[in-house]
A protein has these predicted regions:
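C-terminal "cap" of GNAT-fold acetyltransferases
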Residues: 133-165
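Conserved acetyl-CoA-binding loop-helix of GNAT-fold acetyltransferases
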Residues: 76, 82-95, 118-122
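A generic structural signal for beta-strand entry/edge sites
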Residues: 66-68, 104, 155
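Acetyl-CoA-dependent GNAT
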Residues: 7, 11-73, 77-78, 90-91
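Conserved N-terminal entry element of GNAT/NAT acetyltransferase domains
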Residues: 1-15, 152, 156-165
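Conserved active-site alpha-helix within GNAT-family acetyltransferase domains
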Residues: 87, 111-129, 133-140, 144
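Conserved GNAT acetyl-CoA-binding A-motif
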Residues: 97-109
Length: 165
């Protein structure tokens, strides 16, 4: 077990991201594994939880259209799960989004991924829908957001307001 005091969260430059793929392989399968590996190489920001200089978890983030943040993937090494690493990564992500002026943050999780849904709920994320997002942002803007987020059937879209909303 890793104590949270020993953990640092660091940016991972593009050229060093290959060393994180093993965490994705432990965390995802099928389409999610393929997409997470591709996203890892091209996403604007990857943060890794590090313990004794070794990665034990990661999160992939992107700002969509200036004031909207999106959490693409949170993945934690199997041996480190249930130690609060995912929560540390999500808290760090929210600090980054806030510092960059995000007014709201979205994430999507598989409808049967109870652990991920609980993680996001613990930080104030609530389920939303295309129609709810469209009411605020308009249909075309929402379609473009969904396209960038790659929300697929069988996923629940989650939202958190960051500032007076």
């Amino acid at each position: 077990m890793t104590s949270q005091e020993e953990i640092t969260i660091e940016d991972v430059p593009s050229k060093q991201r290959d060393g994180l793929e093993w965490i994705l392989q432990e965390s995802f399968e099928g389409w999610y594994l393929m997409h997470s590996k591709r996203t890892l190489q091209h996403i604007e920001l990857v943060r890794a939880a590090m313990s004794s200089g070794k990665p034990i978890g990661l999160v992939m983030l992107k700002i969509l259209e200036g004031t909207i943040g999106y959490v693409y993937y949170v993945a934690v090494a199997k041996a480190q799960r249930k130690n609060g690493i995912g929560k540390l990564l999500l808290e760090d992500s929210l600090r980054i989004f806030k510092a960059r002026g995000a007014q709201e943050v979205f994430a999507s999780v598989e409808h049967d991924n109870v652990a991920s849904e609980a993680l996001f709920a613990s930080e104030g994320f609530t389920p939303t829908s295309f129609s709810e997002v469209s009411k605020k942002h308009g249909n075309l803007h929402t379609v473009n957001m969904y396209r960038e987020m790659l929300v697929v059937p069988g996923e629940i879209l989650l939202r958190k307001a960051m500032a007076g909303d």
